[in-house]
Amino acid sequence: ANIDIQTTGDMTNSGAIVARNALNIDAGGTVTNRLGDISGGNVAITAVGDVLNQSGTIRGTDVSVTSTTGSVINETLTQDVTVYGAVGSGTNTVMGATAGISATNTLNIDAAKDIISRGAELNAGQDANLVAGGDIKLTAIEQKNYSASRTYTEANGYTTIEEHTEQTTKQVGSTLNVGGNLTAK
């Protein structure tokens, strides 16, 4: 079965839109896939505004994502949370599901402005064509981790207190996997 969604305004998905064959989304505003799944045989998403894939999945045999006046942003969502330990406080980053736009065969992404993949995945089993009027950016996101401990040791009537705190930050990068030719311009 085919699915054809047309709207003069914005379209937001946070569930599952699954087509056995063709899946077409045409929006006069922004298309947002937040924590959702958009999948089918041939998937074509066109928006006048931005196309935002936020910790969601867009996948199909052939996938085409187009923003005629905006950007295509594929990003893994994060949230920093303050945690309190035995010794002070720090920040932990809660990571959402890894965002991904994937095609078994050909992946086409076309944006009037930028193509941005932030801590996310772009996959093409065959060729990938990334065309941006602005920049193409594959960037990392920060994942922070805080830990703290306090240890008490008693010996010969004395108490020794050891305190340890650690705040680490690592970069979680974006990936671009292409089985065939890559065109980026």
Language-model segments: what does each one mean?
Residues 1-185:
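Binding/recognition "hotspot" determinant
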